[in-house]
């Protein structure tokens, strides 16, 4: 099980059936009354807690006072690929929880069928990741596989083209052929994709227009 905090993350966990228990302060129960009400419909136990207890549970300076205990929702890369996905995000060696959550949220927003964290990465089920994902962690399949080569093998055996994001990519995003099932490789915050770019079918640059 994992403990998450915050309105969006807890709301998503409750509405998708991932939450088993919710812990809430008196003020938070009033502020997030709609979530407390939803717990009743979803058979989620609601436990009142003190502000002091909330501070101990929280990993932020200012606690929202709203927490949920959730069942693990981590998929396997194989299970995601078994669904014959058309679009998959593959963050590689992601070390920052906030970035991991943002990648999950962005993947959810762009209609991806799954996210596979490849290599030694941050725990995608962590509280900070869940909060940064703004609830998307419970809306899209998320997997973690420490073997990057194995992940690439699964992608290719499923017939997906593998594209690498690169600032000096030879193809502009607007010109890339995205008509076939596609997996996007996203590099580490500090070192990018490095030599892993050579494993991709194409290196694509995403211009920042502004």
Task: Please state what every model-predicted region is.
Residues 27-29, 51-53, 75, 120-122, ...:
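Short, acidic/turn-prone active-site loops that include or flank metal/cofactor-
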Residues 31-35, 122-129, 191-197:
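Short, glycine/polar-rich helix-capping loops at beta-to-alpha or helix-loop-helix junctions
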Residues 68:
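Glycine-rich phosphate-binding loops that contact phosphosugars or nucleotide phosphates
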Residues 8, 15-18, 40-41, 74-75, ...:
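RNA substrate-binding interface of SAM-dependent RNA methyltransferases
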Residues 1-63, 161:
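N-terminal positively charged helical leader segments and presequences
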Residues 163-210:
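Active-site/ligand-binding-proximal alpha/beta "capping" segment
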